[in-house]
Amino acid sequence: ARDSKRIWLDSKEIHHGEYVWKMKKAGDVISSAEKVSTLGYDTSDWLSAIVPGTVLNSLVYNKEYPEPYYGVNNKLESGKIPDISKVGREFYTYWFRTEFDVPESFAGKTIWLQPDGVNYRAEIWVNGNLLSTLNGMFISDYINVTDFVKVGRKNILAVKVYPVDVPGTTMPKSWGATGEFHNGGNGNIGLNTTMLMSVGW
């Protein structure tokens, strides 16, 4: 915690926060979302997760895949990191989960949960309750969790993160791509809600 009114749920891994985050591929989780987001659920076979972070950088941290920025590890032809256009969205859909305490000093106050930078879709579960669904690039939300958290006790936050709806492919390049998206791959990535940016050299 950085002040008495806010709690940052940063992971111990990499960020040196106070919270243990775990992750597991959603397709390998047979339990219901309600159970996953409930106290006592067994995550002993889940991987450590980096939060804030991404599915891929957590997988790289766990040595599931090599560092994408080294050499040609990230080239499609290398096959070292599965490309979503080949393996599908489910391959990179993951659960993230942590436990957190709500201080006694929060009693009688309105308590908000503020997820930041979600990409691309997410379900936000707290203590067995689906409280929000997010859609878009680097999305934030403000969720009133007052009636769903237990003050002075341990609580569970579980987030199911989905990649973009239409990943597109790295090739072939298409001049007939959707809208203005002519610069890479088949342009289908532009069918998703994205952010405006400009690049140049």
Q: Model-predicted segments: where are they?
A:
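Mature N-terminal segment immediately following signal peptide/propeptide cleavage
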Residues: 8, 12-25, 39-49
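Surface-exposed, low-complexity/disordered Ser/Thr/Gly/Pro/Asn-rich loops and linkers
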Residues: 58-87
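Short linear sequence elements within intrinsically disordered, low-complexity coil regions
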Residues: 26-28, 46, 51, 66, ...
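Intrinsically disordered, low-complexity coil segments
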Residues: 15-19, 75-83, 150
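Short, polar loop/linker segments at the starts of domains and inter-domain junctions
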Residues: 30-41, 59-69
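Accessory beta-strand-rich segments of carbohydrate-active enzymes
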Residues: 2-5, 19-28, 32, 54, ...
